[in-house]
């Protein structure tokens, strides 16, 4: 991804890394179990109480990124919570979500998009109410891994910036920031090393919609991308993964590696990194599949 920049303390940024894997045109479901992390079959639906679906957004986004999925789930009778993700640091973001989950009654299906996948992985640990984890174009770290490390694991992300993070991100100081930490904003305009916000993150949405998403983005800190993940909840909680084959941010090949390592049930869909906006029906189907087991 990036080579290290002297100005920013030698730490690279690749908030979500990816190449387009132009494979399946239709949605294809595949169950995958990693060796050493194989889980029992979770195919038989439960008949218990309907779970609450908790949706966690990723970097450069807010809770509104889930709006279409929320409407579909509510129409199907699900209670849905969409708490804010502070985007301040993996440990603190996960602790914030873990505390929030204790306010939810009954079984939970916990869903994370992109960086939100790393957050749910840590936040759900030890919470017996969380019956299923769902990863949407998401990071699925194991203990000791960082988002930055996983983003760089496969080549081809549109966030690579030709090895210079300054081609992709604006580094902005903020009050009380630890030494070497910055708020990171994805640049909106393209340059020779970066296709611009809309074509990178939202390449299957109308350019005007991508422009709005870029203008309204929320920053994530550099530290959030470099902090190491703790013990993963997916070792004890069944998981599902939706991989957009048009994702230019987090390479589908790397998403598959992470999904298989976690023993997740994998579904491919023809969508960009923002599949919950461009293919909300496909995303909702995967969430409801998990909910059928979790209920």
Question: Where are these predicted regions, by residue range?
Answer:
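Secretory targeting and sorting signals
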Residues: 1-34
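C-terminal region of N-terminal signal peptides and the immediate post-cleavage residues
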Residues: 25-47, 295
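Active-site catalytic motif of lipid deacylating hydrolases and related acyltransferases
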Residues: 46-104
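Gly/Ala-rich beta-loop-alpha elbow adjacent to hydrolase catalytic centers
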Residues: 111-116, 120
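Flexible "cap/lid" loop of the alpha/beta hydrolase fold
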Residues: 129, 135-181, 221
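Conserved strand-to-loop "acid loop" that flanks and positions the catalytic carboxylate
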Residues: 133, 238-247
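Conserved loop-alpha-helix segment in the C-terminal half of the alpha/beta-hydrolase fold
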Residues: 245-271, 290
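Catalytic active-site module of serine/aspartate enzymes centered on a nucleophile-bearing elbow/loop
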Residues: 264-295
């Amino acid at each position: 991804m990036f080579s290290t920049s002297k100005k920013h303390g030698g730490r690279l940024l690749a908030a979500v890394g990816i190449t387009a894997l132009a494979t399946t045109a239709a949605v294809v479901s595949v169950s995958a179990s990693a060796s050493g992390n194989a889980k029992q079959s979770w195919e038989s639906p439960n008949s218990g109480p309907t779970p609450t679906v908790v949706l966690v957004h990723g970097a450069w986004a807010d809770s509104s990124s889930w709006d279409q999925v929320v409407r579909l789930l509510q129409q199907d009778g699900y209670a849905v919570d969409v708490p804010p993700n502070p985007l301040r640091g993996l440990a603190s973001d996960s602790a914030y979500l873990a505390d929030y989950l204790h306010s939810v009654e009954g079984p939970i299906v916990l869903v994370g998009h992109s960086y939100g996948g790393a957050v749910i992985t840590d936040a759900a640990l030890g919470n017996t109410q969380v019956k299923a984890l769902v990863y949407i174009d998401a990071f699925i770290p194991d203990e000791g891994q960082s988002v930055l490390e996983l983003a760089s694991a496969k080549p081809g992300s549109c966030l690579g910036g030709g090895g210079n993070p300054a081609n992709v991100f604006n580094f902005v100081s903020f009050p009380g920031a630890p030494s070497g930490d910055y708020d990171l904003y994805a640049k909106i305009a393209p340059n020779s090393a970066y296709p611009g916000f809309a074509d990178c993150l939202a390449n299957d949405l109308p350019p005007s919609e991508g422009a709005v998403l870029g203008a309204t983005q929320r920053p994530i800190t550099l530290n959030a991308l470099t902090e190491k993940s703790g013990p993963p909840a997916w070792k004890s909680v069944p998981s599902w993964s939706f991989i957009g084959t048009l994702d230019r941010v987090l390479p589908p090949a790397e998403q598959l590696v992470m999904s298989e390592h976690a023993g997740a049930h994998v579904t491919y869909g023809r969508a960009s990194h923002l599949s919950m906006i461009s293919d909300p029906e496909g995303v909702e189907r995967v969430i409801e599949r998990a909910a059928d087991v979790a209920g």
